[in-house]
């Protein structure tokens, strides 16, 4: 079985500044260094053109990119912004009047970051292994759920009502253009930062 590629929503803003720390391919040209995109005319403005979507594909396996002003701890007392660095592909997509930065990365690379972002390095090896199993299982369940929802279209109802119960699922419908987000809402993912 081929390792799945995970689409992780990192940041959503009117303007996104980032640095390509190696050579990437975008719109048929090789680019690197500091970049800035902004939401304009319903699209993504970059280098004098407006696009509906932009993809920056690394030309080397260990190529990374750094996103500025990534908010972590959303709605927690320790919420703050920081620059984070990621491996893999950077996709920029228009969503709800803003630009969403999505990191496309192999599942095991994603999980390595999740474990190191959520756990203390001094935790026991068995505890870290158990966390990896839980995180992997949860991730694969989210991917399967997203596939099922896309097949159903708008027929998904995030609640179940019986005579004695009303069950409401929160958050599954929150992510429609990526598999999981990078914050505590899903699993904390901070790239290789």
Regions found by a protein language model. Name each.
Residues 1-193:
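Conserved, single-site charged/polar hotspot
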């Amino acid at each position: 079985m081929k390792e799945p590629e995970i689409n992780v929503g990192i940041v959503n803003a009117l303007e996104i500044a980032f640095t390509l720390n190696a050579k990437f391919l975008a719109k048929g040209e090789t680019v690197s260094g500091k970049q800035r995109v902004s939401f304009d005319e319903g699209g993504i403005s970059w280098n004098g053109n407006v696009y509906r979507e932009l993809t920056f594909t690394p030309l080397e396996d260990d190529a990374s990119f750094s996103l500025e002003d990534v908010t972590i701890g959303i709605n927690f007392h320790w919420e703050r912004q920081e620059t984070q660095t990621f491996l893999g592909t950077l996709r920029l997509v228009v969503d709800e009047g803003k630009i969403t930065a999505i990191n496309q990365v192999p599942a095991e690379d994603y999980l390595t970051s999740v474990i190191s972002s959520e756990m203390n390095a001094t935790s026991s090896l068995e505890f870290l292994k158990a966390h990896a199993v839980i995180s992997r299982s949860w991730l694969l369940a989210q991917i399967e759920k997203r596939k099922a929802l896309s097949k159903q279209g708008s027929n998904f109802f995030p609640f179940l009502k019986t005579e004695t119960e009303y069950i409401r699922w929160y958050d599954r419908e929150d992510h429609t253009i990526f598999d999981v987000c990078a914050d505590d809402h899903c699993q904390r993912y901070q790239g290789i930062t």
